[in-house]
Amino acid sequence: MQQAPQPYEFFSEENSPKWRGLLVPALRKVQEQVHPTLSANEESLYYIEELIFQLLNKLCMAQPRTVQDVEERVQKTFPHPIDKWAIADAQSAIEKRKRRNPLLLPVDKIHPSLKEVLGYKVDYHVSLYIVAVLEYISADILKLAGNYVFNIRHYEISQQDIKVSMCADKVLMDMFDQDDDIGLVSLCEDEPCSSGELNYYDLVRTEIAEERQYLRELNMIIKVFREAFLLDRKLFKPSEIEKIFSNISDIHELTVKLLGLIEDTVEMTDESSPHPLAGSCFEDLAEEQAFDPYETLSQDILAPEFNDHFSKLMARPAVALHFQSIADGFKEAVRYVLPRLMLVPVYHCWHYFELLKQLKACSEEQEDKECLNQAITALMNLQGSMDRIYKQHSPRRRPGDPVCLFYNRQLRSKHLAIKKMNEIQKNIDGWEGKDIGQCCNEFIMEGPLTRIGAKHERHIFLFDGLMISCKPNHGQTRLPGYSSAEYRLKEKFVMRKIQICDKEDACEYRHAFELVSKDENSVIFAAKSAEEKNNWMAALISLHYRSTLDRMLDSVLLKEENEQPLRLPSPDMYRFVVTDSEENIVFEDNLQSRSGIPIIKGGTVVKLIERLTYHMYADPNFVRTFLTTYRSFCKPQELLNLLIERFEIPEPEPTEADKLALEKGEQPISADLKRFRKEYVQPVQLRVLNVFRHWVEHHYYDFERDLELLERLESFISSVRGKAMKKWVESIAKIIKRKKQAQANGISHNITFESSPPPVEWHISRTGQFETFDLMTLHPIEIARQLTLLESDLYRKVQPSELVGSVWTKEDKEINSPNLLKMIRHTTNLTLWFEKCIVEAENFEERVAVLSRIVEILQVFQDLNNFNGVLEIVSAVNSVSVYRLDHTFEALQERKRRILDDAVELSQDHFKKYLVKLKSINPPCVPFFGIYLTNILKTEEGNSDFLKRKGKDLINFSKRRKVAEITGEIQQYQNQPYCLRTEPEMRRFFENLNPMGILSEKEFTDYLFNKSLEIEPRNCKQPPRFPRKSTFSLKSPGIRPNAGRHGSTSGTLRGHPTPLEREPYKISFSRIAETELESTVSAPTSPNTPSTPPVSASSDHSVFLDVDLNSSCGSNTIFAPVLLPHSKTFFSSCGSLHKLSEEPLIPPPLPPRKKFDHDALNSKGAVKSDDDPPAIPPRQPPPPKVKPRVPVLMGTFDGPVPSPPPPPPRDPLPDTPPPVPLRPPEHFINCPFNLQPPPLGHPHRDPDWLRDVSTCPNSPSTPPTTPSPRIPRSCHLLSSSHSSLAHLPAPPVPPRQNSSPLLPKLPPKTYKRELSHPPLYRLPLLENAETPQ
């Protein structure tokens, strides 16, 4: 006897590299073919590959040498009916006429490898046949798994989904000999528990899923069972068929209509609406009496005559033979499953009555409640008739009655299902083996049955995977030692391993059926009545043949689709029906949205409009992205023209039947024309209206800028006719009317907060004293609050269209980006103002107080989550004119220096800490806008506008999608306002800041730098003495709200920190520990954002700008560029500061309320008494006059503010600056950094050496040429600009304790650390960035 060949080990260590992954790419194509709207993960495809190789082993075990050998092996090993379908598919694959549709699995790769599996070379046609069988089975598995995934409302097929769906399919389980170990237990591991309470949206979403399932059941009745009756017109009379199926076609038509209405309503739901308004869908149909067919069907199906007629019909021998010839088990399915399936519409109608009540209870819209109430009223007569019919015929309707067990209608919560299974298992004594939940997904029914040959009655539990036979424990539960379980296990039957056979009544039993296992053992169970037997047989047969009937329905639907393709107009008449090709549209590889919709990579404008309004599916994300970004490749007028053209769909060319009807003067009503109108025209037109609605709702500024555009849209909307379109047209008209009113009346939505905003804080200046407003006279809390309110308003007004295409840097920026430019200009002005405030404070004591006050404002910014304000201060303190003020920084309190360190760290390492912080806070907040601008610039410049495909330019929509993602992130922080009170005078003060006055950018830059040299000359060991300009106290009011007036800090995210003078050591920002020191500078190659000021050059349109190592340039703003009216350039700076090692410095103690006096700087130990009068100002010429810092309304001057000066050098320079060289044009993406070598002669941290280093030009008027490296000192400060301090009327000077302790010799400047690495310079992010002449 010949020994059977050993199976080939595909995944052994030796063979795995040859086979693993060979089929995965092809299997993905098969999946896309059978379920184009779903995706499959890699793990699932590898699992199917394993199954396919397992199947290949089975086929090769017979040593096939011809196609007939393979066919015989398939017939012997494949379960029925899958063997017939697999053979038919394989035979068609080897026919010559099928060469136009080749197989997807790689035959050419598998054919040579089969020699290794079989041990001999096989003919190519045999390999082709085998591969065709394997492809059919893989498609069948993916089809089954996809249906399961679709039913559970997921969008990706996983390995677990394949296992679960195969577990429920007896045919595939038999084929692959799978273990029944996949059940609900494994599925419930990641599912959160549900409370069972459904809101309105959940109800509608669940109803859509149930209607789709219900529609499939109706298709099963009509297209599988009724078609089986219609196959033999001689055997079944039309009247007999009508008695069985009644008006099921009318029910099907109603269901299709209702499902379409609900889906359209969900798609067209306004974003401002709390939920879809489904009431109108039911109201319209109820008023048309469209639900009346349910009454007729109930009357026919529930009548006793139905069962009598059906039983007589099925008793005919010819009828039994007819159904048996269609498919194995089909006769039993007709006899037992069809009558129960016909009851589904009856019970589904009652489901509608309950659903309407639930929707009404959950609805939040009064109009929707009215519609639902009208629908309930209109259906009251139908409900009464249904109840009357039901009571008249009174079928015993029990909770366990298997009305429809065909489809796996599981409990809505898997947790409830597993709970039910666990309860049953606990109630069975003697249970062994796997838990029920590990091998079953659904509980079907339970009840008593008699086991023929047994003494006692059995209680049966039926699941989709198991049938459990138990013996009741009669009276034993009360006895000690016995189990408390109600049942004792007798037998278990695995459903996929048994056959169900109907038994005719005999002397030994009646109402019986037989379970036959594979080993030919059989068990006969008998019911008490014919009705109970029918219930059990319906459940068992539906479970056993479910997969067969499923496949029959799928094949019918596929055949219909192939035989009746959707007729469309010719491309010459309607250009939106041109076939997809690489010349007009491309999709992202292996990428789909969560809803399974393919993601567009690029396409022509026509193809993008087609997909925007596609007839097969709606893509809300694509609509939002398109309307946000379309202006970069299409004008609004062009878009309107295209959408109107898309809406006006011509009829397809008439068929011969249509031509005959037209000749007779009749309207053509062919089936394919009706299908065209229903499946193409109506969906497309609804989606065009949906795009119009989104356009006017979210992008109305297009219509504000072009009134002709609005007039054309209104004219078109008013011309739209059709009942289905009516409510959508009315919706668009309402939105336009509302927008017009808001535009005319300035209507704004009133915002209500849970708590009232905190009162306004005042310091020295009070309301009505506008002319005295200043950094030092206003309360630091209120300065931060009012600036936060102003910047929040500016941030929230920026529209996505102002960013797409970098339009804020283009010629028409004033028109296209007005709100963005306002924010940029405000940020620039505020940064310059902070810098000016510091530099113009000549008196050392005043200057330290000003810097300290700015740090307090920074703390409040942090508490308010105003990151834009934080980085404005960082930018100001790191400006060239402020950064060099070493003595000022050294006199700052240690705690405040640490606060500044933390703030500077936000901008380091690609803003890593800032991004983490932003994600960790709750709105409201004001994000740093510069990071978005840089990311958009990088995306715009780093990706081409068009994709080249076969010589054609396709719009690169992937690029637009990336930009839209950035704008979407901006928008998510625009919704939450601050609970703060606007103070009108302070608001006007900050809105009209004009620190530059009438000076040009160059003049203002020189002025600030010269002033900086004047107040702290180069190499000075102590600052010069200047008289105080202010007559008021420099003591800070602190940043704790006034507890005397209000004890809470409502209105801010959290209470402000206590005043720094009184609080213990505390840092507002969570920081990296000081022990974490960086030994090297991180040099990011592409910063994420226009950061705060780097040492950068300028360009008209740059965010990060370049600096030539030999040029002199400065920067004072963190934002991208605005062209300035008084100068060519706009400077953007970002201090990329890095923490170096430092020695701890304990500063000399500074008692509260004590101020530095300039006399104290010249003598050791000299202390000035409190009674000493203030120093007399020196008789010397006043500083250069600057325009007063009294705010001036912008008036007609709304241009950007000139840019700041170039940064000062760290080394002495010649008296005259060298000419500034022009930079060659550079691209802003991936520019390498220029690393300047560290200055020579920095051997150690010697204080005298530090003092000897020249920190300013030899001449005050000499601008520096080498930018100073930004080294983090122990206080990283941000440059600010400030006006002259306001002079209030001088009150009598009280005795002041002005005796500043004599300053000892300055300790080593640990705040200015040595460079252990080259300093960092940033390059331009835009092309053609030039250094100013």
UniProtKB/Swiss-Prot annotation:
Keywords: Guanine-nucleotide releasing factor, Methylation
Region (Disordered): 1019-1061, 1077-1099, 1141-1333
Domain called DH: residue spans: 199-389
GO molecular function, a single term: guanyl-nucleotide exchange factor activity
Signal peptide per UniProt: none
InterPro entries: DBL_dom_sf, DH_dom, Histone-fold, PH-like_dom_sf, PH_domain, Ras-like_GEF, Ras-like_Gua-exchang_fac_N, Ras_G-nucl-exch_fac_CS
Compositional bias segments (type: Basic and acidic residues): 1154-1171
Keyword Methyltransferase part of the UniProt annotation: no
Modified residues (Asymmetric dimethylarginine): 1322
Domain N-terminal Ras-GEF: 596-740
Gene that specifies this protein: Sos2
GO biological process: B cell homeostasis; insulin receptor signaling pathway; lymphocyte homeostasis; regulation of pro-B cell differentiation; regulation of T cell differentiation in thymus; regulation of T cell proliferation; small GTPase-mediated signal transduction
Record flagged with keyword Cytoplasm: no
Domain (PH): residue spans on this chain: 443-546
PANTHER family: GUANINE NUCLEOTIDE EXCHANGE FACTOR, SON OF SEVENLESS HOMOLOG 2
Compositionally biased spans, kind Low complexity: 1079-1099, 1276-1288
Tissues of expression: Expressed in most embryonic and adult tissues.
Record domain Ras-GEF: where: 779-1018
Role: Promotes the exchange of Ras-bound GDP by GTP.
Name of the protein in question: Son of sevenless homolog 2
Compositionally biased region (Pro residues): 1174-1185, 1201-1223, 1260-1270
